[in-house]
C-alpha cells in the first residue's frame, strides 16, 4: 500500500513539473518572438500607460531584455534582464509562474522591474499582476505583441 501511495505522489509531482515546464516553454517562445508594447500599466490604481507608450520591448532567449524608446535620440537600448521562475513548487498553477523583469535603477523602465505574476497569456498578449508586500498596492501590466 505504501508503494502505491508513493507511486501516486511521485506521479503527481512529475505531472506538476511537466505542466510548469510546458507553461514556461510556451511563454518563453511567445515572449521571444517579436516586439512588445506596453498596452496598459496601472501602478497602484493610477493609469501610467502613456508614460510607456513610446517604448518597445524585445525579450531575448538569453535572458537579456532590450527596451527601446522611439522618441529617444540615442540608438542605445535600455538594457535589462528577464526570466521565468516558479514561485511555489507546491502546485502547478499559472499564477505560480513569475515573469521577472529587471532594469537598472534610474532607468526609465525601472518601474517595470519586479517579479510579476502571470494572470493570462496568448500568442499576442501577456497580462501580469504584482501585489506589493507590506500593505503596498497592486500593479497591472499588459504587454501586447506589435
Describe the predicted segments one by one.
Residues 18-146:
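Lipid interaction determinants
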Residues 1-7:
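Sec-dependent signal peptide recognition
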Residues 13-16:
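C-terminal motif of bacterial Sec signal peptides marking the signal peptidase cleavage site
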